[in-house]
Design a protein with these regions (language model features):
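Short, small-residue-biased leader/transition segments that mark boundaries at the very start
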Residues: 1-2
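Phosphate/ribose-recognition catalytic cores of enzymes acting on nucleotide-derived substrates
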Residues: 47-160
Length: 160
């Protein structure tokens, strides 16, 4: 059986090409080729609660080895809650170099306008746009200020 290759913009559409886009953090182009946003669906786990201490509580998701995670960095995301609601989010994918020396990759998301407890519940995080690479900050205050800028960028994304 012969399968016709699909070309788009002179590029053969393939899972390998789309994986390369996700691994590079090019979420908008990956979504364009996939026909939907790349997402992770995982159960919320307890973290160190560092975000809570700086006024930016996050939900924490583990990334199994076999799951394709985007390039380390900060993303505008849309998060689908167990009750059917959606929230805009700012998501960090990476090793959290400001607060950890571990090489373990985690996914942490601040949910704009959300208050509540989601521990033990499954969320779907859809990646919309990469804002920046993951950075190490000298202080938690510098980290907090940068996350506040990222929150403003996420708000602007969803207002457009």
């Amino acid at each position: 059986m012969y399968k016709r290759q699909v070309q788009r913009e002179g590029i053969t559409v393939s899972s390998t090409y789309i994986r390369t886009l996700v691994e590079a953090g090019d979420m908008e182009r990956a979504a364009d080729f996939l026909g939907h946003r790349h997402c992770l669906s995982q159960t919320v786990q307890h973290g160190q609660r560092i975000g809570r201490t700086i006024g930016i509580p996050t939900v924490n998701l583990a990334v199994p080895e076999h799951v394709l995670a985007p390039a380390h960095g900060v993303y505008v995301t849309e998060v689908f809650l167990p009750d059917g609601r959606r929230c805009a989010g700012v998501t960090n994918v990476g090793t959290r170099p400001t607060v950890s020396d571990s090489d373990r990759v985690s996914v942490e998301t601040y949910l704009l306008g959300f208050e509540g407890d989601l521990y033990g519940q499954e969320l779907r995080v859809e990646f919309c746009r990469r804002l920046r690479g993951e950075q190490r900050f000298d202080t938690l205050e510098a980290l907090r200020q940068e996350i506040q800028r990222n929150i403003q960028q996420a708000e602007a994304y969803f207002e457009a």
